[in-house]
Each structure stands twice: as structure tokens, then as C-alpha cells.
Amino acid sequence: MSSFRVNVTAVNIRDQQRTTPPIEALVDTGSELTWLPADVLQSAGIVPVRTSSFQTATGQTISRPVGYAILRAEGFETIDEVVFAEPGDMTLLGVRTLEGFSVTVDSIGHRFVARATIVAFWRNH
């Protein structure tokens, strides 16, 4: 399975005129949340609402601020939690954001594929 990157824009949910410039992020289906540089998020007025702990691939536990933003990439959009990444942290587009976009990842074609909406219940009268 190959990896690829996309440009992500984060939008302030309280003031949608405030956005980040496009941020190149690795599409990472192994990461639950999206990680974007803290300074770039803060420049758009996006603020942390709490601090969460994360376990790295090396088993180290780290703490990072987490907030909410509208995330856009490749023509898709969702509101999601975003981790305020520190220098040295990877910039990642996580699986929850991908689920919010309602896409699957075509890792061979290096693109997102829109999923069909699933109707949970349908009654035809």
C-alpha cells in the first residue's frame, strides 16, 4: 500500500472568513485524528478546547491540544476534531476526517473515492 499527500484547508467554525492556507498532509488511515501545525491553526483563530494524550508508533505517550475546525480537501468537507501538532510532529489527515468526507482511499490511484450514501431504513408505502 502506497501513501500520498493532499492539501488540506482548516476553517474557523466561528468565523468562516478565517482559513488556513493549504497545508500538505499525509493521508494516514492508521491515525484516528487529523494533525495540523498549531501555529497555522492559531493563525486562523482556531483554538484548542482540551488536551488529549496520544500514543506514538514508538510507544511514547504525548499530550497535544485538540480543537474543532471545518476541514476541506479534494472537494470534500467536514467538521472534525483537529490536533494542534508541534514542530517535529507529522502533518496527517486521519481516518475520522476521511469518514466525515464519506470517502474511501484509493492508495493505488492516490485519490479519494466518494462512497454512496447508505440508507439505514426505507419504507415504501
Give the positions of each predicted feature.
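Pepsin/retropepsin-fold aspartyl endopeptidases
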Residues: 1-125
